[in-house]
């Protein structure tokens, strides 16, 4: 008997000698966007293997730093869905933008993979938005190098490594990129209620920047959604844990 994940269909990948769960939709591609101040390298470490396990090709756009950050991410979704529907998603800001895009393109979105949403509606005092604004101000006051050093002073080693690489990659546009993300409204709960495709939501039980209450609220608002959780301390040693939680939630939502 196959486990719950494989009830949606599976086949043997003879080249790799593994059982590959088949996606419950006709989509063949998943486009995953990074979070605020993050990059495609981290997204790949989270989602590449879990997506391959369900037969989806991962498209992981790199951020375009600066004021065009959001529009470039949305354009990447448009381009990927030009010929056929896609599964869209991302982490934090990336999840917000995927849901925003799906609201405007419901016929081109076969599902949503929503990891660590940070707020719904206006960002206002959401911890993730406050943190991004504070970081942007620090970059402008101290310069990127000193701001990065201050940001990583009291965080776990894995997060320090991720922040250093990603923030360095944004170059002189780091502060503008952080502010652009912090000021972007996410879909409201009422808007999320209009998304009828299967949606997998993932949250962390120990993440103060992306409170689990937000992921729970998104899950309750979405008509066809499931929530799976993990912990930051696990992601620190196994980034794929976040991807597995999100993909598993999507598979569960697809069966409902």
Protein language model annotation of sequence segments:
Residues 2, 9, 13-67:
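Conserved HGGG/HGGXW glycine-rich cap/lid loop of the alpha/beta-hydrolase fold
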Residues 161-190:
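Hydrophobic, aromatic-rich cap/lid helix
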Residues 225-256:
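Catalytic active-site module of serine/aspartate enzymes centered on a nucleophile-bearing elbow/loop
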Residues 90-98:
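Gly/Ala-rich beta-loop-alpha elbow adjacent to hydrolase catalytic centers
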Residues 208-214:
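Conserved alpha/beta-hydrolase "acid-adjacent" motif
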Residues 116-165, 174:
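Helix-rich cap/lid subdomain of alpha/beta-hydrolase
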